[in-house]
Amino acid sequence: MANDSPAKSLVDIDLSSLRDPAGIFELVEVVGNGTYGQVYKGRHVKTGQLAAIKVMDVTEDEEEEIKLEINMLKKYSHHRNIATYYGAFIKKSPPGHDDQLWLVMEFCGAGSITDLVKNTKGNTLKEDWIAYISREILRGLAHLHIHHVIHRDIKGQNVLLTENAEVKLVDFGVSAQLDRTVGRRNTFIGTPYWMAPEVIACDENPDATYDYRSDLWSCGITAIEMAEGAPPLCDMHPMRALFLIPRNPPPRLKSKKWSKKFFSFIEGCLVKNYMQRPSTEQLLKHPFIRDQPNERQVRIQLKDHIDRTRKKRGEKDETEYEYSGSEEEEEEVPEQEGEPSSIVNVPGESTLRRDFLRLQQENKERSEALRRQQLLQEQQLREQEEYKRQLLAERQKRIEQQKEQRRRLEEQQRREREARRQQEREQRRREQEEKRRLEELERRRKEEEERRRAEEEKRRVEREQEYIRRQLEEEQRHLEVLQQQLLQEQAMLLECRWREMEEHRQAERLQRQLQQEQAYLLSLQHDHRRPHPQHSQQPPPPQQERSKPSFHAPEPKAHYEPADRAREVEDRFRKTNHSSPEAQSKQTGRVLEPPVPSRSESFSNGNSESVHPALQRPAEPQVPVRTTSRSPVLSRRDSPLQGSGQQNSQAGQRNSTSIEPRLLWERVEKLVPRPGSGSSSGSSNSGSQPGSHPGSQSGSGERFRVRSSSKSEGSPSQRLENAVKKPEDKKEVFRPLKPADLTALAKELRAVEDVRPPHKVTDYSSSSEESGTTDEEDDDVEQEGADESTSGPEDTRAASSLNLSNGETESVKTMIVHDDVESEPAMTPSKEGTLIVRQTQSASSTLQKHKSSSSFTPFIDPRLLQISPSSGTTVTSVVGFSCDGMRPEAIRQDPTRKGSVVNVNPTNTRPQSDTPEIRKYKKRFNSEILCAALWGVNLLVGTESGLMLLDRSGQGKVYPLINRRRFQQMDVLEGLNVLVTISGKKDKLRVYYLSWLRNKILHNDPEVEKKQGWTTVGDLEGCVHYKVVKYERIKFLVIALKSSVEVYAWAPKPYHKFMAFKSFGELVHKPLLVDLTVEEGQRLKVIYGSCAGFHAVDVDSGSVYDIYLPTHIQCSIKPHAIIILPNTDGMELLVCYEDEGVYVNTYGRITKDVVLQWGEMPTSVAYIRSNQTMGWGEKAIEIRSVETGHLDGVFMHKRAQRLKFLCERNDKVFFASVRSGGSSQVYFMTLGRTSLLSW
């Protein structure tokens, strides 16, 4: 142990007797900070010679430390490798203020080693430069160590260079002398990254000690700093580095380019056990230090480099230097002048030193003369000797007392250490018991949680099995009903054919009777030809007529009865169903199946309450437990009847007043009353003239089934009542064409149920078009040319005016796509539009179509489909526009007029700014767009081959910033002036400076161009994903690597970079997606997704556990997003994977009995600020509520395409589409600031 009491010789230093610096030195500017004061560049007034002046306030508390520093500098600064101490002055202050002490030292104008490394290309010095500087450092340390002084703060900033490339050690503010008897210290002082393990151990263990060899560890770290630009662990937080240095193996040089001598020197300096570390003299004999043949050339190179650096830096970037004195104290030792500096001084320096020595000598002579004069006057020689003997006796007595006191103190400290060790052992025992108790509680809790989770899983499986069983029973009942109806149909068909055969036989029988009667009449005529009197030409006698009643009575009708009856049946049937194919079949004696209309040629037959009450049912609310985007609005592109429209096109070319299908069964969830001028859809069945309203039947875009008619007897309402199921079944049942279609029909019936089951629905009914022809049909239109025919007045009225069941109209929010060509209004119906209506309070409804070349179809709001009728009628969710009787050429439009906008808003009830819009930029990128981030209003775009800036504020120009580097992910942090990226072939985490990127565009700052524009975060490679999380004023960066997760935190000035915070390695499941949540503002948890599910890591304890594992999926999954739900204190999450999403909390418990179900497998899922989530699929873009998972909106694609989410801000969402061939374009969607609340 060292003696911590001040040295007695320091009492002799009288600060008040020092001279005032006024007129001798003047301060020029501040150049740095020392341990106890600021360092100025000063100038000698008379000679102009520069000096370093350390200015300190003299307080009572720090007076002893200042004396120690003066003593240390005075005694040990006279060496060529230590900054020379010139003298001290006192600047008096007014009463009430502390005096200022000026310490004048040698000025080193070339700066520190740290400045030299920073101003060198690549931030690394040559190996022979490092050897020369290390040797000079060791020589200075050897001088200090000989005098038992430990510097304790060796680092690059405390090693300065003169203009002649000489190396000087400075800052004795933390140095101390060793006790000569013990030789070790145990105080915790130094800079973290350069600190030796034994010095760090003193902070944790009071019994730990160290000696002068701790300076040699710091010398080795300084050598690494010169070789690599920074000390090891510099990316870590300082407290983290203090934790790792004693536990990690000794650091080594990373690069293999250095010589074996250099590696050996580093190994010698960095020995963790300081007792085995070589001494200073041994390291000076090391080959790396000893063998320096070209020392003169090295000094010349260093001097030239220093001169070049000073010219570049100029006056504005002066180097900061740190000078200070010692902190510790020691007993008095004989004062030594020390060896004078052996360096060649700059002219003027020797004069300055002689002036100081002369001033000090004069002061000393004057004080000695006064003392001699006083001693001669007051005391005699005998009294002096007596006084000296008394002093010696007292001193001896005092020494004995100090020894006894020290012995007692050491004994007391030993007892205290024993008591402390006992307490620590007891505390460790209690902690182990507490730890075991907590582990037991945790084990029990986990067992209880596992048991509860297993029970919940078992109950869930049972519920699913019960639900599936009920579904199968329901489907079985549906199938039985359909089979029963099929048997009834077949029975009716057989009965019809039997009756036709009876009629045919009756007609043949009547024909034979007629022939017999004709033969009989011929015979009578033959008899009448004979000559008779006039009265003999009367009719035959009555008894003869009565003998043949069956031949004579029906004579006027016998020949015409079958044809007349067929005409009556045809007329009666034409009045009810507007079609007559079956009536024509009566004359041929067989049943014909009418042609099946295509989607663009037919409307469904809406029936009113007055005619067919069996078809009416209350509208059911559409609130599925598992939400999907399937709705009746979305038509099937793969409909088996799609192709039949061209085969039956002849039926569409006939006159609409005479040839329409007899009865159409439409497969939709609800039936709509089709209004017309003066007639309804119900009256078209009951009282209207045949063919009077050919546009009065609505087509939904779903597949149709056509029922064959067998005979003309019976009203249409009776046939409908037999065909439709009971009202309490809550769904329509449709007649199939043939028994082979029963399976498909049962599947279709399940698809249109109002309440969907909570399990996954496998068939997705969305398509690229909502109505009309496909892209292939568009090509047919181009080939046929402009052969168009206009529809009749009824067609125009049906397509341009819509009257709902309660006489009110609807305004529908639409999606508008702005492309290279702006939209133009047109009043003709488009072949690709689908009109969505709902009840509102507007006055009228008109139809307006726009032309566009976009790849998107109108925006669809599913809440428009959930309409409850206000009266006794039913309301449809879909109204298509086409006409049964219209020729196909009349429906097909110009292929350039492909309408993608349906706007039913005649009264302008909503401004255009509230309408969801999609725009795209004309710029096509040659390589695939992988990521993007908003920088101000402009967009930084990262692709497979580089980084570019898309100027959104100007003409849309693209500026290339970085070429030939892949950018996978990026985020702009403008407040920190950085762009965080995962980039390069090795997927490193790089941070680019925004000022450097801005200068690559503007080229207005040549200083910025010379600096390196980016840096890496640690040595991380193979980054998969990262997330920047802001909590209060702390910015965390959580990074997913191939098999680990790293957490970094932003360290402000002077570090100004991300520094390591936590690391979790060797994870069981490899992370693919990562996020960080703060539970209740206290606990940090890392949430990450893998191919097996979602997991959490407690940052404090490092424990890893599962949050949600989708066990119903056997293969690996693809996690899409981790959404931390708002207003839950970071406790509840929505995790999206595959085509599903579940609500869980951070402890793995299901919070909502709802499964978010996408309509198809999304390629990208993102959370947007409007508290919604968006999914990009190949067929559509879906917008869903984050809180409930319900579908809020759908944007359909005209053709399948792959989309990728980029970024979002406020009401704008940016995404990219990738075309075949590699080109990619940027889209942005403007949702409208208020539209999200009013959809």
Curated annotation (Swiss-Prot):
Cellular component GO terms held in the UniProt record: cytoplasm; focal adhesion
Alphabetized InterPro entries for the sequence: CNH_dom (IPR001180), Kinase-like_dom_sf (IPR011009), Prot_kinase_dom (IPR000719), Protein_kinase_ATP_BS (IPR017441), Ser/Thr_kinase_AS (IPR008271), STE20_Ser-Thr_kinase (IPR051700)
Cellular compartment(s): Cytoplasm
Polar residues bias: start-end ranges: 578-588, 599-610, 707-720, 788-809
Residue ranges of domain CNH in the record: 926-1213
Principal subcellular localisation of the protein: cytoplasm
Chain intervals with Acidic residues compositional bias: 317-338, 772-787
SMART domains, A to Z: CNH, S_TKc
Source domain of life: Eukaryota
Modified residues (Phosphoserine): 5, 324, 326, 629, 631, 639, 644, 656, 700, 712, 715, 791, 800-801, 805, 823, 852, 855, 900, 913
Basic and acidic residues biased stretches: 554-574, 663-672, 722-735, 747-762
Catalysed reactions, semicolon-separated: L-seryl-[protein] + ATP = O-phospho-L-seryl-[protein] + ADP + H(+); L-threonyl-[protein] + ATP = O-phospho-L-threonyl-[protein] + ADP + H(+)
Organ and tissue specificity: Widely expressed. Isoform 5 is abundant in the brain. Isoform 4 is predominant in the liver, skeletal muscle and placenta.
Keyword list, A-Z: Acetylation, ATP-binding, Cytoplasm, Kinase, Nucleotide-binding, Phosphoprotein, Serine/threonine-protein kinase, Transferase
Region Disordered, annotated ranges: 306-349, 421-462, 517-811
Residues with PTM N-acetylalanine: 2
EC number(s) given by UniProt: 2.7.11.1
Region Mediates interaction with RAP2A, annotated ranges: 858-1212
Residues the entry annotates as binding ATP: 31-39, 54
Subunit structure of this chain's protein: Interacts with the SH3 domain of the adapter proteins Nck. Interacts (via its CNH regulatory domain) with ATL1 (via the N-terminal region). Interacts with RAP2A (GTP-bound form preferentially).
PANTHER family named in the record: MISSHAPEN LIKE KINASE 1
Function summary: Serine/threonine kinase that plays a role in the response to environmental stress and cytokines such as TNF-alpha. Appears to act upstream of the JUN N-terminal pathway. Activator of the Hippo signaling pathway which plays a pivotal role in organ size control and tumor suppression by restricting proliferation and promoting apoptosis. MAP4Ks act in parallel to and are partially redundant with STK3/MST2 and STK4/MST2 in the phosphorylation and activation of LATS1/2, and establish MAP4Ks as components of the expanded Hippo pathway.
Name of the molecule in the record: Mitogen-activated protein kinase kinase kinase kinase 4
Native source species: Homo sapiens (Human)
Gene name per UniProt: MAP4K4
